[in-house]
């Protein structure tokens, strides 16, 4: 059961002051080329440090489930509260901008909850940087290859660290892409919202250009510096 104060890692006595959703990345999460959408989240902590995280809709669903498990006395309230409504709104969003706004709204709801929840181990662990976040921050997966005798996919490295999420390359979204790819973006990644795994089959072509990127940035997000105590 999660405690009201998180003592599991270096995040003790810290909490998330604000969070914003900057955009979406599509990452390959299996050897078959299945893709999943990850929201890029900018978080500001109580010590003014900033972390950039990547979380999927499935991650948000698991957070909701873990909160209910961690606080069984409040299970019915959490099950019918704003978190559930927020997840449904994200799932039903029909365009990228609406989805980004709904994710941001849900995250702000979470960090605005009573300290019992917002500073619990469950929530702070969700906002802690993961190995996947570190790989995407470096934006160069080849840096970790020399640690292995033979070529290895990021998926294998992530699983060895206890993560089932991974990427072998970064696929990003742009509104100017050909119509053929528009059909690919129509896949709803929220169909299996409350399941641990979900499938997003798609066929990738060689030479995909990862330069395009869908953003949800305001002036505040464009501040040209980052304070990060985790480096």
UniProtKB/Swiss-Prot annotation:
GO terms for molecular function: phosphatidylinositol binding. It comes from the Eukaryota. Residues 1-134 form the PX domain. InterPro entries: PX_dom_sf (IPR036871), PXDC1 (IPR040288). PANTHER family: PX DOMAIN-CONTAINING PROTEIN 1 (PTHR31433:SF0). This is PX domain-containing protein 1. It comes from Homo sapiens. The gene is PXDC1.
């Amino acid at each position: 059961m999660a405690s009201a104060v998180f003592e599991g890692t270096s995040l003790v006595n810290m909490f998330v002051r604000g969070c914003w959703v900057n955009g979406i990345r599509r990452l390959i999460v299996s050897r078959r080329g299945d893709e999943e959408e990850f929201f890029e989240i900018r978080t500001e902590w109580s010590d003014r440090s900033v972390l950039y995280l990547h979380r999927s809709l499935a991650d948000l669903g698991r957070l909701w489930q873990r909160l209910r498990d961690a606080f069984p006395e409040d299970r019915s309230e959490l099950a019918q509260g704003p978190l559930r409504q927020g997840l449904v709104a994200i799932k039903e969003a029909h365009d990228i901008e609406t989805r980004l706004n709904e994710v941001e709204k849900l995250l702000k709801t979470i960090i605005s909850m009573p300290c019992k929840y917002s500073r619990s181990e469950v929530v702070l662990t969700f906002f802690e940087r993961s190995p996947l976040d570190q790989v995407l921050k470096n934006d160069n997966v080849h840096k970790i290859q020399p640690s292995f005798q033979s070529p290895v996919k990021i998926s294998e490295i992530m699983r060895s660290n206890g993560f089932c999420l991974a990427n072998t390359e970064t696929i990003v979204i742009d509104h100017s892409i050909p119509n053929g790819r528009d059909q690919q973006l129509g896949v709803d990644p929220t169909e299996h919202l409350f399941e641990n795994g979900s499938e997003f089959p798609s066929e990738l072509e060689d030479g995909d250009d990862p330069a395009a990127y869908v953003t949800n940035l305001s002036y505040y997000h464009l501040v040209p510096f980052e304070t990060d105590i985790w480096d």
